[in-house]
Amino acid sequence: MKYIHKYLPVDKSAKILDVGAGTGRYSVQLAEEGYDVTAVELVKYNLGILKKKNSAVKAYQGNAMKLSRFQDKEFDLILIFGPMYHLYSKEDKVKALTEAKRVLKDEGVILVAYCMNEYSVLTYGFKQNHILECMENGKIDEKFRVQPEEADLYDYVRLEDIDSYNDAAEMERIQIISADGPSDYMRPVLNAMDEKTFQTFIEYHLSTCERLELVGAGSHTVDIIRKRDNKKHE
């Protein structure tokens, strides 16, 4: 939530759109803080759980690539914290970004989460000893890039992929962070920590999550973007 709050307007009348809201982990909390929050979720089951929470969130079923319910330049802040995991082509990812851009106010900000390629290769490929099998069946190519299909549920990207989506959608980066840092590599160690040591780890993560040399190595990144000022690029 630290980076959501960093880019939220102080004015509680600010309008937030949570695309791929799931069961409302972020949208419900933001609504409880007094913000005007709208949630879009593709999966009916998740949407049902969200609505049962009886929050002030306005929740609808919908697709990240088609936000036709909403007007142009309607929202101050947009969260896309799930859809990019499950969109498998560059075209679809760019379409989701372009739709979010359309409903974003000119001075607004979008936070977009991605699953990262290297985490998948290192953990499932090497740690769990599937690397040779995956390379033989084409799930991981000769450049160690994951090649998922829809049946695999998740898509994985590298930083250069994220850059290409932003370029295609004419968005520019404010900053990019590692959402998890090294934590998903060391869950048993974290679970065994005493509270003081764990809090020190959290402090470490927050102090390093913006370091570019670490961003692509974690399991997830959050890209924080805004509309590109094309005058700067002329």
Segments and roles (model prediction):
Residues S68-I78:
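A short acidic, Gly/Pro-enriched loop at the edge of an enzyme's catalytic core
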Residues I110-G138:
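Conserved class I S-adenosyl-L-methionine
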Residues I174-E234:
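A C-terminal cap/extension of S-adenosyl-L-methionine-dependent methyltransferases
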Residues V94-D106:
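A short glycine-rich, Lys/Arg-flanked "PGG" loop and its adjoining helix->strand segment in the class I
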Residues L153-A169, I176:
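Short alpha-helix
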Residues G20-G22:
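Class I SAM-dependent methyltransferase "Motif I" SAM/SAH-binding loop
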Residues R25-K66:
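Class I SAM-dependent methyltransferase SAM/SAH-binding core
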Residues M1-K12:
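Conserved alpha-helix/loop element of class I SAM-dependent methyltransferases that forms part
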